[in-house]
Amino acid sequence: MNPGELNRAELAQLAMMLEVSAYPKPGNVDRCHDYPDTRLEHFLASIILARPALQRAGEASAGVGEIIYEAVDLSSVHSGGNTHFGAFILLVPLMMGGGISGATRVVHETTVDDAVDFYRAFGKTKVRVLSGDELDVNDPEVYEELRRRGMNLYDVMLHSASNDMVAREWVNGFALTRRTADRLWEEGCGRDSIVKTFLWLLSVEPDTFVIKKHGQDTAWEVMTKAMEVREGLRDLETFDAECIRKRINPGSIADIIIASIYVALCEGWQWDC
């Protein structure tokens, strides 16, 4: 498929669909298993319902924060909780900027209003946050505090980057997204390459969502086991089942994978082979 045949919104939807359809990806919802409170159809509904916001992102017709809020708002009508918040945080600037270099410019040009809209979106999700953050999404005064400090959305991501790998992409030029897209190309085409790329990323980067929910030790244990799978020392499906049983869901890794698939698709990477 020629990427020129699809617009940016369609490519973003395709990237999200390919990520959730690939299996097995240890701990993630996919076509083979759900969690009791979040199912495959919740992810698919989110992908479909977010289309108007993704269209605006592709046209760069509104601010980053406003579009992220709209995407979350449109996709939050189901009961499955947060499905694509992290993915929207990455996809929106990538779409608005036409790629990684443009996205880097876009994030630096964000405004205080973008930050406020982002926090409004954050408040609609059930994303786990670390306690004690001075910019607590649950604090009703947080919007005024953002304005008092003059913090734009890039500043907010900089504030969070030390403990959130999605925020970190904003401040390091989407470096991990680039590395992961390159890895996807190296692994070849189609679904199996997505699974292999996911396992590679899981083995080299501690998932910050896992850290927030289960702690640093569990995140490092997951990395070690993912490496053992890659080295043929551990069975992939057994590892997947263990993660599901313990509700260890590498959700931030999945967000990076979505962004990387989007970048690769824009470059002509083939999913249907």
Describe each PLM feature range.
Residues 1-62, 98-247, 264-273:
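Phosphate-rich cofactor/ligand-interacting catalytic cores and adjacent structured alpha/beta frameworks
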Residues 79-92, 246-262:
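Conserved phosphate/anionic-ligand binding catalytic regions in large, soluble enzymes, centered on
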